[in-house]
UniProtKB/Swiss-Prot annotation:
Keywords per UniProt: Antimicrobial, Disulfide bond, Fungicide, Plant defense, Secreted, Signal
Homology family: Belongs to the DEFL family.
UniProt KW ATP-binding keyword: no
UniProt-annotated location(s): Secreted
Intrachain S-S bonds: 33-59, 45-69, 49-71
Cellular component terms per the entry's GO annotation: extracellular region
Protein name: Putative defensin-like protein 36
Length: 74
């Protein structure tokens, strides 16, 4: 009975670790977006993220900082 609990716990931990790999994590670059409305019309944020090796990026609004470039992972 104890070995079943240990096996269940190990499988549960493995599932949690694998699920964490699939979640997109944003990478905050600290670069302000040039467009005050938050649109990446000129593609600078996307180009920056591609140059850094990330698959994508976009401008996301923050209350205290305005729109910032955020790269996507995964």
């Amino acid at each position: 009975m104890a070995s079943n609990k240990v096996s269940f716990f190990l499988v549960l931990c493995l599932c949690i670790l694998l699920a964490g790999e699939c979640i997109e994590s944003p990478i905050f670059t600290g670069n302000k977006c040039s467009d005050p409305t938050g649109m990446d019309k000129d593609g600078k944020c996307l180009d920056y993220c591609h140059a850094q090796g990330y698959p994508g990026g976009s401008c996301i609004g923050f209350i205290d900082q305005g729109y910032m470039c955020v790269c996507k992972v995964g």
